[in-house]
Curated annotation (Swiss-Prot):
Name of the protein: Bile acid-CoA:amino acid N-acyltransferase
Consequence of substituting Q417K: Translocation to peroxisomes
Modified residues annotated as Phosphoserine in this record: S125, S416
Family that this chain belongs to: Belongs to the C/M/P thioester hydrolase family.
Tissue localization of expression: Expressed in the gallbladder mucosa and pancreas. Expressed in hepatocytes (at protein level).
Native organism: Homo sapiens
Single GO term (MF): N-acyltransferase activity
GO biological process, one term: glycine metabolic process
Outcome, altering H362A: Abolishes N-acyltransferase activity
Impact after mutating G386R: In FHCA3; uncertain significance; contrary to wild-type, undetectable expression in hepatocytes
Amino acid sequence: MIQLTATPVSALVDEPVHIRATGLIPFQMVSFQASLEDENGDMFYSQAHYRANEFGEVDLNHASSLGGDYMGVHPMGLFWSLKPEKLLTRLLKRDVMNRPFQVQVKLYDLELIVNNKVASAPKASLTLERWYVAPGVTRIKVREGRLRGALFLPPGEGLFPGVIDLFGGLGGLLEFRASLLASRGFASLALAYHNYEDLPRKPEVTDLEYFEEAANFLLRHPKVFGSGVGVVSVCQGVQIGLSMAIYLKQVTATVLINGTNFPFGIPQVYHGQIHQPLPHSAQLISTNALGLLELYRTFETTQVGASQYLFPIEEAQGQFLFIVGEGDKTINSKAHAEQAIGQLKRHGKNNWTLLSYPGAGHLIEPPYSPLCCASTTHDLRLHWGGEVIPHAAAQEHAWKEIQRFLRKHLIPDVTSQL
């Protein structure tokens, strides 16, 4: 009898799953197909083809895919190779507390599949739950003064390292990374800063005092270590994360994922001090063969006069973790990170770590998330970049390094525990 098993059936999205098929004919060719319906009703699909061993088994931890959406030994390939049925759709989790993503995995006889359409019922199937929050994590809506967001607290009395989580130009409130960080032991504040509730849809300036209030709010919490907070930032959020690290003594560890070393778009203001954005070169915006916009050439930080717009990163006292995808088509993130590191070196600083991933794109998400290489954002068809397999490897490695970095620099005396 053919059986399809998965362990665990219900897990956090950053946890691997062991999938195995048994009871097959020795050396039978089979196809594993996965599907997921997101919160908007959009479908995502993946497939991979395998040959059973002499015992009639296919163990995805050891077997090599011979075709489909990936080839080789990739135990979690069915997850990170999911592709949207509707082009330019990004998989986003909004409701992290109440509903997991459900991934259906079905097993077919490969000979019965013609033109990628299933010709008969699956030989076996199962449904997996992929959660963005662990049991016991609490979510507290934040509406204190100007602050808008959601605070996620791990189970237990604490104390916990505190982290502020910042996304980019999409706006609104994205909680999935903060909820996962809380599931891994961090008190995590998912902080909105535009296009959410009563916050401006398109702010004219970035007010750094707002983020200072967020840092103080987190440090005041009785379950949070009071020695300093961390920041995890991506894209547009990176320019804010950098400024926080420079100007706020409360920030002691900053993760910068695919961002710039200068403000862009709008000025930054802090206690009356104005930092103007680097002008962009609109003529350098390009469109690729698929009609997707590529923005990574639009900021020229080596041009005459550009240095006045760069952040004085050498003034920061905390630690930096730069994470860059070398295949990023939205921001020239590797060049910007290397330029920032060059500033630090020239000032005798060694408070930085660089993780640079060949083949990874702009949207480096938690492990096993599907690559989104392009999507429609604010009516723009943007090319984010990335290649499926190296991007997946980057996500898995970076997530571990982010947690290690934050624990090392946010938990007092953690070095004595290593």
